[in-house]
Regions:
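DNA-contacting surface of Y-family translesion DNA polymerases
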Residues: 8, 181, 189-333, 338-354
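Gly/Gly-Pro- and Ser/Thr-rich, intrinsically disordered tail segments characteristic of DNA damage-repair
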Residues: 1-215, 219-222, 338, 342-355
């Protein structure tokens, strides 16, 4: 049995909450953090805006239609990074085993905690109180014996909540959950599972491992483990992101020249994610999967780091043109990614050397 004590801390509507904290006029108002424009996407939405159906990564024009009276605020990433640093300093008071996932969430391994608090639940409660008292922001937290369960737990009582999944209660907790609550289970996989009568995590647990592996390959093994509350992945402090990518599965297979809008949307999503993590990338990657499940990748490394959403989009579309196939070939998945990251500090120093 896993005896670790893992906490997942997730700042509630982080960017929007920072804006509301710093401007009293925004408190209680629906706030959408996004650039205005036809191709922009929502970076964050306050809970007041979410009541109208606004969600992160939604096209900004759609968000404006759903909530026309919302206040649109352009993102201020330097300010968010500064607040995120303050949050991390609070987390590090309790353990050195802190794995940031983004500016607004992190995993902590508090199996041994610096403050000698008697339980992981007490550590999580203290962290939330310190964030509230020192930064005037709300955070949700989940406590469990592994990262997978802790993440589900932190979502359970949002916003501004704390939830604990005890080891002997994990299976009972997971059993009735819909399959889409499992990481990696999107619309397409949910549909495939539904077609074979699988709708809940408990249904997955009742399937033989061989059936899951036959249907979903290596991820079938992962589903088998998750349905049993198993996750051996360690908390990895300072683990660098190797790549940032996004992909989409079409409802029906499409021709190559019908992928423009999807590539642009994915490029916007990837660019926003790289900005959120303050990452500087040198390589742009395009991924395509044919209707016959053949995977094609094309990449390009410009002479200087990728500097804008427009550059990312132009290069991704150009990479598509390098795909030489029968014009009648159809595709089921397209993806856009950034990789070959550089340290922003080193990059800035190198730029200065050559000015």
């Amino acid at each position: 049995m896993d005896t670790r004590k893992i906490i997942h801390v997730d700042m509630d509507a982080f960017y929007a909450s920072v804006e509301q904290r710093d401007d009293p006029n925004l408190r209680g108002a629906p706030v959408i953090v996004a650039w205005r424009g036809k191709r922009s996407v929502v970076c964050a939405a306050s809970y007041e805006a979410r009541k109208f159906g606004v969600r992160s990564a939604m096209p900004a024009v759609q968000a404006e239609r759903l909530c026309p009276h919302a206040v649109f605020i352009p993102p201020d990433f330097p300010r968010y990074r500064a607040v995120s640093k303050s949050v991390r300093e609070i987390l590090l008071r309790h353990t050195d085993l802190v794995e940031p996932l983004s500016l607004d969430e992190a995993y902590l391994d508090v199996t041994e905690n610096k403050t000698r608090l008697p339980s992981a639940t007490e550590v999580a409660r203290t962290i939330r109180e310190q964030i509230r008292q020192e930064l005037n922001l709300a955070a949700s937290a989940g406590v469990a014996t592994n990262k997978f369960l802790a993440k589900i737990a932190s979502d359970w009582r949002k916003p501004d909540g704390l939830f604990v999944i005890k080891p002997d209660e994990a299976i009972a907790f997971l059993t009735p959950l819909p399959v889409e609550r499992l990481p990696g289970v999107g619309k397409v996989m949910t549909q495939k599972l539904t077609e074979v009568g699988v709708r809940t995590v408990g249904d997955i647990r009742n399937l033989d491992l061989a059936i899951l592996q036959n249907q979903f390959g290596r991820y079938g093994t992962r589903l088998h483990e998750l349905a049993r509350g198993m996750d051996n992945n360690p908390v990895e402090p300072n683990r660098p992101t190797q790549s940032i990518s996004a992909e989409d599965t079409f409802e029906s297979d499409v021709l190559l020249n019908e992928t423009d809008a999807t590539i642009r949307r994915l490029a916007e999503k990837v660019w926003q994610a790289s900005r959120k993590e303050s990452r500087i990338a040198r390589t742009i990657v395009l991924k395509l999967k044919t209707a016959e499940f053949t995977i094609l990748t094309r990449s390009h490394t410009p002479s200087s780091p990728v500097s804008s959403f427009e550059e990312l989009t132009i290069v991704a579309l150009a990479l598509r043109e390098k795909v030489q196939m029968n014009p009648r070939q159809r595709f089921r998945i397209v993806g856009v990614g950034l990789s070959n990251f550089r340290d922003p500090i080193i990059e800035s120093a190198e730029d200065l050397l050559f000015e």
